[in-house]
Structure formats: structure tokens, C-alpha cells
Amino acid sequence: MALFKKNYDRHTHMHGKAGNATLSRSHAGNFCVFLFLLIVGAFMALPLVYTLVQSIKPTEELFTYPPKFYVKNPTFDNFKQAFQLAGNLWVPFTRYLFNSVFIAVVGTSVYILVASLAAYPMAKAKRLPGMAFLSQLIVWTLLFRTEVTAIPQYVVIAKLGMVNTYWSILLPALAGTFGVFLMRQFMVSAIPDAILEAARIDGANEYKIFWRISMPCVKPAWMTLIIFTFQSLWSATGGTYIYEESMRMLPNVLSQIAAGGIARTGAGSAVAVIIMIPPIIVFLISQSSVMETMAQSGIK
């Protein structure tokens, strides 16, 4: 009995040491991963930090060499200069702002609806003929870069008479397939077929099932899609389809102000900061849903 107890204690002690060593290695590995991601995140944030610092630097600090990532005497003169220059443009600044807000808000809202309506039958109407092929076709279209379809898109827009209109920006955006792919993949795994069948048995039509069951279940997906779509449309310039100055977007203000040479470096940075604010706000509002989407994608 004593010999058995001695062997048991030795065995437990050895396994305890092995468990502690494994736990220590796990903590060390997690720390290394965290440190690596922290360094990568810092490098990714450097352009944003540098632009923000440049926007509040006085003129005498803007052109120091080597460039500094800090400011000794912060000032908002660059923002004042930016608004003064924006007031002297051919078209009022508010017109550029309205164009960008209209395109971003309307385009994002309509695209979420279109992508969801297109993805729902691909994910849940499996009995319809051609759904599998159509789903594969959506994936294939993701292989083509925007430059490949630029000329065909322009020809279509020109033939439809939509040049110099909001439709020249909205229509190509609404035809994007990334949102359809994202929503379909999420609907396949996030919406159980049993729930849909139970709703149909209870007398719910497809319209109610889509809005009251399907869309709430895939909220993380369409919140993520809102961020990507809003960012894409907010930064759109419409340079290919828009020629009238009154129809141009807010990023054109940055290009016009920056065209003044190095004397407008600070004002250009100030405008860049102003343009970055709305997408950052949208991301912060939707951040929790984005993290949930990434977590569920990792689980799948």
C-alpha cells in the first residue's frame, strides 16, 4: 500500500510539473502573439497618427527633417486654412459634402438590401434550379479586379446616359458581389432551416420570414458590410464618370487643396483628418458586430 502511494505521488508530481510547463509555454506563446500583433497594429496606425500630427503642426514644424511624430506647439491654424480654402472653391464646400453623404448613405442602405435579397435564395432556396451554379458564379466574380471591369462599366454607364449623375457611382456599387457572398455564407450557417420551416408552418410568408427572422439572425454580417460599403463609397471620387464640378465628391476637395503645393501641406492634412472622421465613427459604432462576425467565422 505504501509503495502504491509512493508511486502515485511521484506520478502526480511529474504530471503536475508537465502541466505547469505546458501552462507556462501557453502563456509565453500568447504573450509573443500579443506582442507581434501589437507591433503590427502600431505600424498600421502610424500613417493615421502622422496625418493627425501633421494637421496640428505649425508651419515651422511641418518641414523639419527628419519628420517628427509629435508636435511641440499644436495649433488649429491648418483647419482654419482648410475651411478658408474650401470657401474659395468654384463650388461651395457644402455641395461636396452633400454629394458624399448622399452617395455613402443611400448607396450603403440600398446595397445592404440588394445583397441580402440576392443572398437569401442562394442560401435557403436550395431546391430552385441553378442556385448552386449561381453561388459559384458569385465566387468567380471576386477573382476579377476593379480595373478589369472598368472599361465595360463605363461603356454601360455611357450607353444608359448616366454619366454626370449619381447613378454612375451607385449602379456599379450596387452590382458588387462581395456583399452577396458575405451574406450568403453567413445565412447558410447562422439561420437554421428548422426555424424557417417552423415559421412557414405557423403561417408566416417569405416576406415576414426574411425581415423578422433572417435579417436579425445575420445582423453581425450586414453591420460588417455597412462598414466596408460606407468606407468604399465615402472615399469614391467619381473621376471616371463625373465631370461636372457640382457633382464631385468630398475627396476632390483634398486633391484641389493639395494641388496648391507644399504651402498647403498642413491644410491638406487637416482635410484628410476631416474626411477620415465619418468612417471611423461608423466603425466604432459597429465594432462589436464586426468582432462577432470574425469570431463566428473562426468557429465555422
Show which residues each predicted segment covers.
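A hydrophobic, multi-pass inner-membrane permease signature
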Residues: 2-300
